[in-house]
């Protein structure tokens, strides 16, 4: 094997393992790190199974999630990989986006085929916008009958097609994570084949700086003799001095203005970009024209909406959530980016109520418009206390 040297210039991609309990997600994660460590020792450390299985707990918006993070490199790319030990952790992670995925490895045991959680994870992947899936047909060493293997593969492809993934075309790689961990040459190669499929069929994500400019407003100030300054962290894109922007959300009408100055740490800049905390000086805007919770955008790139469908996870009592269920027409606050907006919840037909610890679909009507797109995340709050988290799956109006 030629040695690949560590280059920070390598594309970085976030992936994760999803699939039914005991189909081998964590074993496969460990096997990938071992196989890549053996193939490219300078690039990778092997992470043992126990370190991944005893994942530390993280808190995201008050929700406790056990997530294991490992990293590894192929010759082409640098990967950050998430694996969750429990089924509930997966659901919370996927809905809250605690660890965003550019693509996923769906692990299906060849001995079982698709199971209920396989379906649930694929449905969630579709709903929360995991864009690409590669299938690892695990425990392939335990199935001798080629016909059975082909049937299982067909079943997985049909399931993926049913949820609008390209089931007929996406890669399905037969692996044995356990045998690869034990150092078996044939199955070690299968894991390398899997990573080649991941390299080739999960595209590099668009970088935040390449997306249209958006900055949520956190604060508004007046600077005597200069005008109104809004501050916030640029969520995406690049903004240059003297560019025109729209300010939308919260109020019914949008405001269009020109950015006459960009400051960071009291220094004037020519441009600000994704990830930076900046102050923007706005031409001809009075302090009362803008408020926290609005967003500043590249004109026309995002629109404000009041009604949307969402997938949400409701905190359990142990997580500090509600102690009782809620019903149709529940009216909490929805915290988008930097502010709370009250909304009315409509539950799906046939859902009487939602218990703490459940995940559910819902349709929400907000009392004020919010700049939103599919995939936007929010917290559900009652008087400042987080009781749930979710993301927009479809805009209604």
UniProtKB/Swiss-Prot annotation:
A GO MF term: GTP binding
Residues covered by the tr-type G domain: 10-206
Region (G1): 19-26
Annotated stretches, region: G2: 62-66
Catalytic activity: GTP + H2O = GDP + phosphate + H(+)
Chain intervals for the UniProt region annotation (G4): 138-141
Domain of life from the UniProt record: Bacteria
Stretches of the chain forming a coiled coil according to its record: none
Enzyme Commission designation: 3.6.5.3
A Gene Ontology cellular-component term: cytosol
Protein name, entry field: Elongation factor Tu-1
UniProt subcellular location: Cytoplasm
Enzyme class: hydrolase
Binding site for Mg(2+): 26
Metal-binding as UniProt keyword: yes
UniProtKB keywords: Cytoplasm, Elongation factor, GTP-binding, Hydrolase, Magnesium, Metal-binding, Nucleotide-binding, Protein biosynthesis
Pfam families recorded: GTP_EFTU, GTP_EFTU_D2, GTP_EFTU_D3
Region feature G5, mapped onto this chain: 176-178
Chain positions covered by the region annotation G3: 83-86
Major place of residence: cytoplasm
Cited CDD domains: EF_Tu, EFTU_II, EFTU_III
Subunit organization: Monomer.
Protein's job: GTP hydrolase that promotes the GTP-dependent binding of aminoacyl-tRNA to the A-site of ribosomes during protein biosynthesis.
